Amino acid sequence: MPELPEVETSRRGIEPWVAGQTILRAEVRNARLRWPVDEEIIALRDQRVLSVQRRAKYLLLELEKGWIIIHLGMSGRLRVLPQPQPPEKHDHVDLVIGNGCIIRYTDPRRFGAWLWSDDLRTSRALAHLGPEPLSDKFDGRWLYQKSHNKRTSIKPWLMDNTLVVGVGNIYASESLFVAGILPGRAAGSLSEEEAGLLAESIKAVLLRSIEQGGTTLRDFLQSDGKPGYFVQELQVYGRGGEPCRVCGTPIQMAKHGQRSTFFCPACQH
């Protein structure tokens, strides 16, 4: 599933093509996504895009009247087509832009979503979200305060969007490795120093992945069709049985919250 770096990469990829431009129309070939594409999007005509934003794993297109909220789901991606091209099987939604380009949404598994909101303050999709991990609000003090008396394992705890948004399976594993913290420990066992180190590690890993265009494991591609190159820098995720790049110990895999977790038993404590 695309996580924060992949969604931010998508945002940066489409922003130069659509910000300040007019969406002439939306062409919806298959409205049956995770939730049906909202009727306001299907009927969209001649609306100028004021800004392209991101909140958590959602892309937000601010229009003159209303917002388009896009979630990429498990396998969704956005492409910029400078010129029209015939759609393929999994190309479900096009935004036809006044400058001649098309923003095309492709989603083989159809777990993504295209939602409409008149006012983001009333959007159910964005309710109850925690702070952005790259914001000043998210730091070691925040993590330490929230960890008190928590018995759940640190890894699934980090993936709770009410704690911090956008940290999914890949980046939780990678951040815990950088911080030297075992993912199976109880969240309540974090010391204040460890919480600070973990917050810094999350920020560093996410920023580096954004610089590299995200991580391509299967479906994700950048808006220009290139893969995300952070996959070449993964320290533990998807490397079960392979030697740790730091100490040579075989990387182990475990299940936490029914999700695969990867870690080095020597480097993490």
Curated annotation (Swiss-Prot):
<dbReference type="Pfam" id="PF06831">
    <property type="entry name" value="H2TH"/>
</dbReference>
<feature type="binding site">
    <location>
        <position position="150"/>
    </location>
    <ligand>
        <name>DNA</name>
    </ligand>
</feature>
<dbReference type="InterPro" id="IPR010979">
    <property type="entry name" value="Ribosomal_uS13-like_H2TH"/>
</dbReference>
<dbReference type="GO" id="GO:0003684">
    <property type="term" value="F:damaged DNA binding"/>
</dbReference>
<dbReference type="GO" id="GO:0006284">
    <property type="term" value="P:base-excision repair"/>
</dbReference>
<dbReference type="InterPro" id="IPR035937">
    <property type="entry name" value="MutM-like_N-ter"/>
</dbReference>
<protein>
    <recommendedName>
        <fullName>Formamidopyrimidine-DNA glycosylase</fullName>
        <ecNumber>3.2.2.23</ecNumber>
        <ecNumber>4.2.99.18</ecNumber>
    </recommendedName>
</protein>
<keyword id="KW-0378">Hydrolase</keyword>
<dbReference type="GO" id="GO:0140078">
    <property type="term" value="F:class I DNA-(apurinic or apyrimidinic site) endonuclease activity"/>
</dbReference>
<dbReference type="Pfam" id="PF01149">
    <property type="entry name" value="Fapy_DNA_glyco"/>
</dbReference>
<dbReference type="InterPro" id="IPR015886">
    <property type="entry name" value="DNA_glyclase/AP_lyase_DNA-bd"/>
</dbReference>
<comment type="function">
    <text>Involved in base excision repair of DNA damaged by oxidation or by mutagenic agents. Acts as a DNA glycosylase that recognizes and removes damaged bases. Has a preference for oxidized purines, such as 7,8-dihydro-8-oxoguanine (8-oxoG). Has AP (apurinic/apyrimidinic) lyase activity and introduces nicks in the DNA strand. Cleaves the DNA backbone by beta-delta elimination to generate a single-strand break at the site of the removed base with both 3'- and 5'-phosphates.</text>
</comment>
<feature type="binding site">
    <location>
        <position position="90"/>
    </location>
    <ligand>
        <name>DNA</name>
    </ligand>
</feature>
<feature type="zinc finger region" description="FPG-type">
    <location>
        <begin position="235"/>
        <end position="269"/>
    </location>
</feature>
<keyword id="KW-0511">Multifunctional enzyme</keyword>
<dbReference type="Pfam" id="PF06827">
    <property type="entry name" value="zf-FPG_IleRS"/>
</dbReference>
<keyword id="KW-0863">Zinc-finger</keyword>
<comment type="subunit">
    <text>Monomer.</text>
</comment>
<feature type="active site" description="Proton donor; for delta-elimination activity">
    <location>
        <position position="259"/>
    </location>
</feature>
<dbReference type="InterPro" id="IPR010663">
    <property type="entry name" value="Znf_FPG/IleRS"/>
</dbReference>
<keyword id="KW-0234">DNA repair</keyword>
<keyword id="KW-0862">Zinc</keyword>
<comment type="similarity">
    <text>Belongs to the FPG family.</text>
</comment>
<keyword id="KW-0479">Metal-binding</keyword>
<feature type="active site" description="Proton donor">
    <location>
        <position position="3"/>
    </location>
</feature>
<feature type="active site" description="Schiff-base intermediate with DNA">
    <location>
        <position position="2"/>
    </location>
</feature>
<feature type="active site" description="Proton donor; for beta-elimination activity">
    <location>
        <position position="57"/>
    </location>
</feature>
<dbReference type="GO" id="GO:0008270">
    <property type="term" value="F:zinc ion binding"/>
</dbReference>
<keyword id="KW-0456">Lyase</keyword>
<keyword id="KW-0238">DNA-binding</keyword>
<keyword id="KW-0326">Glycosidase</keyword>
<dbReference type="InterPro" id="IPR000214">
    <property type="entry name" value="Znf_DNA_glyclase/AP_lyase"/>
</dbReference>
<dbReference type="GO" id="GO:0034039">
    <property type="term" value="F:8-oxo-7,8-dihydroguanine DNA N-glycosylase activity"/>
</dbReference>
<dbReference type="InterPro" id="IPR012319">
    <property type="entry name" value="FPG_cat"/>
</dbReference>
<dbReference type="InterPro" id="IPR015887">
    <property type="entry name" value="DNA_glyclase_Znf_dom_DNA_BS"/>
</dbReference>
<keyword id="KW-0227">DNA damage</keyword>
<feature type="binding site">
    <location>
        <position position="109"/>
    </location>
    <ligand>
        <name>DNA</name>
    </ligand>
</feature>
<dbReference type="InterPro" id="IPR020629">
    <property type="entry name" value="Formamido-pyr_DNA_Glyclase"/>
</dbReference>
